[in-house]
């Protein structure tokens, strides 16, 4: 089941709540659109289509490693008291087009947008370590980029990651309520010279406050310890 199927399923689940807004994309992009879940998309930054050229004997273990890392990242991150009431709806799985995690708020106090941004940043941190380690050992690895959006904007975010996303970058496309959840924790910047309404609405993660980055570093280390223990086992 590839990423597009998962994304389509996510969108279908969400269509009903947006029918009242009319079918045009602009209404769906309304800054006050309601949301109680976010989608985190992780895609490989693979300019030369190297992944599909790899022999399955190399590609499949690499995708399995990425899947394992992402699932451990979700499990460890959601133990954080700050993210109480946020849960993962699916078990993410990497294929050539990346992976997709849907997080939902189980109550009105749960900071699901913050959880999405923290998960995206955490995976990018982990991926960079694995990437650098693999390259050092002359093994295959790719940099990644990530997008965090509400479910109404999953497709738009896929396009944004392709058109404006740079390697190791995180793009964010959320309604006001979501931006409000993350404002105190992260710095955001705008897309330079936007050419579409989505590019204009999109924000680029430009760093987190010390407390958040420290928290993420702790979770990253916990995930890497699990990884090392399993490798030795």
Residue ranges of model-derived segments:
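Intrinsically disordered, glycine/charged-rich C-terminal tails and inter-domain linkers
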Residues: 1-35, 160-233
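Catalytic NTP-binding/metal-coordinating core of nucleotidyl cyclase/transferase enzymes
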Residues: 4-110
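Structural motif
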Residues: 43-46, 145-152, 174-177
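Short, surface-exposed beta-strand/loop "edge" segments at domain boundaries and coil↔beta transitions
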Residues: 48-54, 109-111, 154-158, 179-183
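Short C-terminal domain-edge/linker segments immediately following a structured domain
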Residues: 70-77, 131-135, 177-180, 203-205
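Catalytic core of nucleotidyl cyclases, primarily class III adenylyl/guanylyl cyclases
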Residues: 82-112, 129-161
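Acidic, low-complexity cytosolic segments
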Residues: 113-117, 121
């Amino acid at each position: 089941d590839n990423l597009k199927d998962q994304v389509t399923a996510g969108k279908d689940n969400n269509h009903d709540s947006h029918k009242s807004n009319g079918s045009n994309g602009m209404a769906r992009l309304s800054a006050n659109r309601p949301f109680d879940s976010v989608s985190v998309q992780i895609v490989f930054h693979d300019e030369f289509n190297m992944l599909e050229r790899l022999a399955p004997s190399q590609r499949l273990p690499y995708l399995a490693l990425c899947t394992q890392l992402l699932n451990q990242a979700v499990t460890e991150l959601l133990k954080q008291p700050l993210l109480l009431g946020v849960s993962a709806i699916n078990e993410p799985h990497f294929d050539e087009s990346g992976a997709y995690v849907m997080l939902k708020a189980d109550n009105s106090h749960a900071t699901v947008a913050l959880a999405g941004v923290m998960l995206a940043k955490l995976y990018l941190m982990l991926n960079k370590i694995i990437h650098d380690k693999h390259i050092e050992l002359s093994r295959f690895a790719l940099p990644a980029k990530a997008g965090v959006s509400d479910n109404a904007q999953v497709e738009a975010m896929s396009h944004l990651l392709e058109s404006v996303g740079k390697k190791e970058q995180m793009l964010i496309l959320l309604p006001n309520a979501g931006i409000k959840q993350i404002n105190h924790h992260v710095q955001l910047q705008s897309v330079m010279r936007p050419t579409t309404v989505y590019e204009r609405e999109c924000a680029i993660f430009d760093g987190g406050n010390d407390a958040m980055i420290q928290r993420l570093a702790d979770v990253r280390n916990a995930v890497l310890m699990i990884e090392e223990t399993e490798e030795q086992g």
